Structures are given as C-alpha cells and as structure tokens.
Amino acid sequence: MKKILNLLPIFTFFIFYRFYDIFIASKSLIFISGLTCLLYWIIYKEIDKINLFSFITIAIFGSLTIIFHNSQFIKWKITIIYMIFSVILFISQFFMKKPIIQRFLEKDIKISDLYWKKINFFWALFFLFCSILNIYVALCLPEKIWVNFKVFGLSFLMFLSILITSIYINFKMLKEK
C-alpha cells in the first residue's frame, strides 16, 4: 500500500500533464501529494519525514509554478530535493560516525562499516548525478521530454540503483558469512 501511495503523485502529475498542461498537472500534484500525506496519517498514524519533505517542496515549487505561470519552478524541485539528499549523504559520509544509510538499515542488514560507507557514497553520487541530469534535461530539452524523463527516466534510474545496491548487499552478506 505504501508503494502505491508513493507513486500516486507522480503518475497523477503525468496523467494531468498529458491531458492538460504543466500548470494543471502542478495543481494536481500539490493536491494528490497533500492527500497522500493525509492517507498516510489515517492509515499508518504517521507521516514519514521524506513524504512530508516531498509534500512541502511540491507545495512550494508547485505554487510558484502556478503563481508565476513559469514551469521552471516545478522542474527545479527534483534537482533541489536530490541535491539536498546528496549533501546530507556526503556530510554523513565524512563528518559522522556512521553514514546515514547505515543508521536507517543496519538493524535489518548486517554488513561491515566499510560496505556501508561504499553504499552511502554510491547513493550520494547517484543523487548528485540525477540532480545534474535533471538540470540538463529541464533546461536544454522540450518540456514534454522533461516530463517523460522525470516520470520514467528518473524512476528507472532509481529502480536500477536500488537493484544494484540490493545485489551488492546480498553479495557482501554472503561473503561475510
């Protein structure tokens, strides 16, 4: 159920963009993101920090897109989110005792600290790469291509990175046994 709730805003944005325009799609994105947070609260009695952060950035950048009738605001949203994630991961990599990914997952996944650092660094680079790639696509290519890239391209890259990380973790867990 959580996966469906997480995908609902992006696919709603895509559908409304296809039938209308980026401004109607931005309105729908704000509404569905807020509704998703409300459903999280009703079903799970909590809203996780990432979903709340996502809703706040969607509300801010979506509203700016609508108010100023300028699609650049919504296009920059994912770049800023991914850049923030990258910075947080890099900071945890170099200035904290444990990388942030390790803090979230070490209860369920038992691998050495060295491997956690590699995974954390991989994800920091991944988010940096995606934020730069989004800037390029948003600024240099037509809006329709950016929407497809945001919905399908970034989703595919995320899926691929999760798959690579999962394979790496499984390999390292087997190696350490």
Swiss-Prot record:
GO terms for cellular component: plasma membrane. The chain crosses the membrane at residues 22-42, 50-70, 76-96, 121-141, 151-171. Keywords: Cell inner membrane, Cell membrane, Membrane, Transmembrane, Transmembrane helix. It is found in: Cell inner membrane. It is a multi-pass membrane protein. Its main location: membrane. Pfam families: IspA. Belongs to the YciB family. HAMAP family: YciB. PANTHER family: INNER MEMBRANE-SPANNING PROTEIN YCIB (PTHR36917:SF1), INTRACELLULAR SEPTATION PROTEIN A-RELATED (PTHR36917). Plays a role in cell envelope biogenesis, maintenance of cell envelope integrity and membrane homeostasis. This is Inner membrane-spanning protein YciB. The lineage of its organism: Bacteria, Pseudomonadati, Pseudomonadota, Gammaproteobacteria, Enterobacterales.
